[in-house]
Amino acid sequence: MADRKAQVSRDTLETQISVELNLDGTGTGKFNTGVPFLEHMMDQIARHGFIDLDVTCKGDTYIDDHHSVEDIGITIGQAMAKAVGDKRGIRRYGHAYVPLDEALSRVVIDFSGRPGLIMNIPFTQKRIGKFDTELFWEFFQGFVNHAGVTLHVDCLRGENAHHQIETVFKAFGRSLRMALERDERLGDAMPSTKGTL
């Protein structure tokens, strides 16, 4: 079986980003992005997805975090698409419900080749510490567009905004883990009646 690893760099006038990931890792995360709360969330992807994820970013955070957050999502999406390859033998679909105290979120993903984000998180605060909660949409939209996935994200309940988004990222990691798992019954087959994704 081929290694499912990828390294992608993205350089613009706003950000310089490097992402390395291993889809068959142990859940190790290394982050140096200048956006600490996003690093905390990406660590949930690594740990709950059993994905080794190394992300570095130098961005124009003296303006705000928008460019860094969006471009990190884009670059992780590009690395994901590269590591997944032609999708032969994977389960394709993944889903997870994750609670954290009063908060509960559901994430459903399809490695369909068709980018789509449907996201409903009724945040109880506009900021978590210094982090603008609107930027989570930018992160996931960047990821979806470049990974070529359909992603449904719903926070079903929650009072604490930190708990709300942490359950989302944990569920995202777990849904990735399920969707990317190799199914021995599929062998080298494409998980689609069309024969292609």
From Swiss-Prot:
Entries under PROSITE patterns matching the protein: IGP_DEHYDRATASE_1 (PS00954), IGP_DEHYDRATASE_2 (PS00955)
UniProt pathway annotation: Amino-acid biosynthesis; L-histidine biosynthesis; L-histidine from 5-phospho-alpha-D-ribose 1-diphosphate: step 6/9
Any one Gene Ontology BP term: L-histidine biosynthetic process
Gene this protein is translated from: hisB
Tree of life domain: Bacteria
Protein's recorded name: Imidazoleglycerol-phosphate dehydratase
Reaction equations catalysed: D-erythro-1-(imidazol-4-yl)glycerol 3-phosphate = 3-(imidazol-4-yl)-2-oxopropyl phosphate + H2O
Species of provenance: Saccharophagus degradans (strain 2-40 / ATCC 43961 / DSM 17024)
One Gene Ontology term of the molecular function aspect: imidazoleglycerol-phosphate dehydratase activity
Swiss-Prot/TrEMBL keywords: Amino-acid biosynthesis, Cytoplasm, Histidine biosynthesis, Lyase
Main localization category: cytoplasm
